[in-house]
Structure formats: C-alpha cells, structure tokens
C-alpha cells in the first residue's frame, strides 16, 4: 500500500482571499462562459452549472426552468421523454449496459451525452468511452464520462475519447460510497489535481458533489473546475420529482 502523506483539502478547509477589483457591484460579474471541446465539434455558451442526473433532480421540470438561465440539466437516465427537440442545454445520461445501436432517445435531440457510473476505474468503462467516440450515434457528441477522482484516471478517460470528465467519488450529500467502501478523495484537492491534468490535454472537468453552499461553487471554479454539478443544493425544490416528507 502506498500512503499519501501530503495534505489534501475539502471545501471546508479553505477560504478565498479577497483582492482588489474594478467591479462596483456583484451584479457586474459575468457568469457565462464559452467552451470549445477537445473531440467534439460543438461549442457551448452559458452558465457552467449542471443539475445532477440524480433520480429526483435531473427532471424535465428542472430542465425547463434552468434553461431559461442558460444552465444545463443532466436528465436522469430513467427519465423517459420525447418532448425535447434539439436543445443545447439538455444532457442525456446512459450507463454501461446501454446498447448504442438502440438509444432510449433520438440521438439528434441533444449535443451532450453522459456516461455515468459509480466507479470509472475499470477497463470496461474506458473501453466504452472509446466505443462511444467511434460509434455513429455518439461520435460527434460532447461526451461526459465519470466518475473518477485522480489525475491519472482523468487523463486516461480524455485520451479514450471523452471531452469532459466528471470528478468526485463519494462527496455528495446522500452518497454512502466513502462510508460503505472507504474509497474517495477530498473534493477540492481532486478538483485542483484533475483540472490540471485535463487542461494539459485540452480537456475539461466537472466537479460533481460536495457543494452545500454557494461559496463551495466559487471555490470549485477557483480550483480549476470548468463546470459544477449540483444535486443536494437543488433537491427539495418544486421541480424535483421526490416525495415531500414533513418531519
């Protein structure tokens, strides 16, 4: 076993030191960014925040609201909807068992596709990313793949054909991976290290999980994240599909 003895950080471990600014109001801050991706020919401009593809967060109702603000929604892979035509702010989600010859949606309805698994450290996962980049239905898409939490895995996934790697093993508010398996990595350090690896290859990352307050989103971007994926911070809103529990 190799012991990592250098300090690793989470969101609660740091604060952003203030600096002098030319802005006179927070309203003057420009939140939108424009991206061009490594493998895909697509570009995208908007606010780089993504509603998570969790069961009760990545809903059609959530997408309808967030797209008004040019924010992305990753639809849960169990959401069955034919209401979407071409939409640049919708991300479709699939798993490793998905037959790319028989996608559960019209492949022409969105430029994004997300391969979502709990553990991106398998050969099967990387092979599937390569298959997606070569397959007729997905080869031109903006491919998101994850999750991983180390720079070596980030580089491997980008080289396999992904445009964006999803970063985070176990930081989510309802995720039990760390408790049940002991596997994970402090999310802020994971973001810093994986962003450096991805950007060195012309790729991008999504910080997925661990944000509980708006300041965590700011820290994620400061650490090098290109996109931030939110689940718990959006859960409980009217657009979620979960049942209301009154305690």
Question: What role is predicted for each listed range?
Answer:
Residues 204-237, 241-243:
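Active-site capping/gating regions of soluble enzymes
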